[in-house]
UniProtKB/Swiss-Prot annotation:
It comes from the Bacteria. NADP(+) binds at V13, R44, K106, G188, E191, G303. The lineage of its organism: Bacteria, Bacillati, Bacillota, Bacilli, Lactobacillales. Disruption phenotype: Mutant containing a deletion in both hom and thrB is unable to grow in a defined medium lacking threonine. Catalyzes the conversion of L-aspartate-beta-semialdehyde (L-Asa) to L-homoserine (L-Hse), the third step in the biosynthesis of threonine and methionine from aspartate. Na(+) binds at E130, V133, G135, I137. This is Homoserine dehydrogenase. One of its GO terms (biological process) is methionine biosynthetic process. L-homoserine binds at E191, D202.
Length: 428
């Protein structure tokens, strides 16, 4: 027998599926005792069809989703179009038509995941999306299965390959933000509009999905604090290294007694931290749990073959669940009420880069300002000034989010001081 699937969108990942099906044909046959067949492919227009055929692909290419929905032989629809629309509409229609769905669309899932999962359960079909987070790392299924008997207290990830590539260039080769972005765009890692990558939006979408699997809580995009790379200067990167850290864009979730706190931000990681050596476009997820302890999952965050492999794994899982009669079960079965942490309960050390007048007594004034909010210094570095302005760099002891906000407000209100940058610092 054959399992017939349809693909919506035949770009980088979509064109990688046929190769994987061919390379793993024998293994898949032994696992499933069935063959997975690409029955139809939805294309954008006739020009796209001609291009695909010129590349040697001879599938039943269609321009109308109804051709797929009306085909009773097709049991799985694989959405690889990206963006929220028309993907949301197409997935909704596929679910309502009784089709199981696989998608790699993190943007869609972060914004409309609750609605789509509810619809899938209503129609007793599967909605799987392993490839939506850290494409080549099977992190979602690992969280759903291997950590089902464990309590996760902390998750830290490098979740965006583009920003990690840029930070690697800035850290290892001394490039500026603009230079590293230009190279990322030249290599095709970053879009012409890099907003989602450099402002932490892409990573926040992935973090929202990870929250559901690791903590059982659904986060709206606005529940996640976000800051990106645009303000980072070469001096920030150099000072991080001087103090024994590496600067990375991370996504982090902490659970405390009052709830969870999620944030995407540039972070000073100790050079000894497992994620400090994750470079280039690679992704990694670091997990602290009460049972297992510390775990690290590392792999490609994107790319044709890694992402297509995760997509195919979802297809295989659906076929197996259909055979054993458990297809109606949710991809993630761990859910509880969402509780956001009290900002008084979230503590970290912080790096502050502050521009001051280059005159006697300014450091003392800065100390007094921080002391007024009960913030003490772990490390201080006063850089050589130009006679008019100087820069003071501070790493604080641990402070909570309320203290952090108060310090930032006071610095911004002081006419003689200018807060250049503020980054989270991990480590004891």
């Amino acid at each position: 027998m054959a399992v017939n699937i349809a693909i919506l969108g035949f770009g980088t990942v979509g064109t990688g599926l046929p190769t994987l099906l061919s390379e793993n044909k024998e293994k898949l046959a032994k696992i499933l005792d069935e063959e997975i067949v690409i029955s139809k492919v939805l294309m954008r227009d006739n020009k796209a069809i001609e291009k695909a055929r010129s590349q040697g692909f001879n599938y039943d290419f269609v321009l109308n989703l109804d051709d797929i929905l009306a085909d009773s032989e097709i049991s799985i629809v694989v959405e690889l179009m990206g963006r929220i629309e028309p993907a949301k509409t197409y997935i909704t229609q596929a679910i309502e038509a009784g089709k199981n769905v696989v998608t790699a669309n993190k943007d869609l899932l972060a914004v409309h995941g609750v609605e789509l999962r509810s619809l899938a359960q209503k129609h007793h079909v599967a909605l799987y999306y392993e490839a939506a987070v850290a494409g080549g790392i099977p992190i979602l299924r690992t969280l759903a299965n291997s950590f089902s008997s464990d309590k996760i207290t902390h998750l830290l990830g490098i979740l965006n390959g583009t920003s990690n590539f840029m930070m690697t260039k800035m850290s290892e080769e001394g490039w500026t933000y603009d230079e590293s972005l230009a190279k990322a765009q030249e290599l095709g890692y970053a879009e012409s509009d890099p907003t989602n990558d450099v402002d932490g939006i892409d990573a926040s979408y992935k973090l929202a999905i990870l929250s559901e699997f690791a903590f059982g809580m659904t986060l709206a995009p606005d529940d996640i604090a976000k800051s990106g790379l645009r303000s980072i200067q070469k001096t920030d990167v150099e000072i991080a290294q001087q103090f024994g850290y590496v600067l990375k864009l991370t996504g982090e979730i902490n659970e405390v007694d009052s709830g969870i706190f999620a944030e995407v931000s540039p972070t000073f990681l100790p050079k000894s931290h497992p994620l400090a050596s994750v470079n280039g476009v690679m992704n990694a997820v670091f997990i602290e749990s009460e049972g297992i302890g510390d775990s690290v999952f590392y792999g490609a965050g994107a790319g044709q073959k890694p992402t297509a492999t995760s997509v195919l794994a979802d297809i295989v899982r659906i076929v197996k669940r259909v055979k054993d009669g458990t297809i109606g079960k949710s991809f993630n079965e761990y859910a509880r009420s969402t509780s956001l942490a009290n900002p008084h309960d979230i503590e970290n050390k912080y790096y502050f880069s502050v521009e001051t007048p280059d005159s006697t007594g300014q450091l003392l004034l800065l100390v007094e300002l921080f002391t007024s909010e009960n913030v003490s210094f772990e490390q201080v570095l006063q850089q050589k000034g130009n006679g008019k302005r100087a820069v003071v760099v501070i790493i604080s002891h641990k402070i909570n989010r309320v203290q952090l906000s108060a310090i930032q407000d006071k610095l911004n209100q002081e006419k003689d001081f200018k807060l250049l940058n503020r980054f989270k610092v991990l480590g004891d």
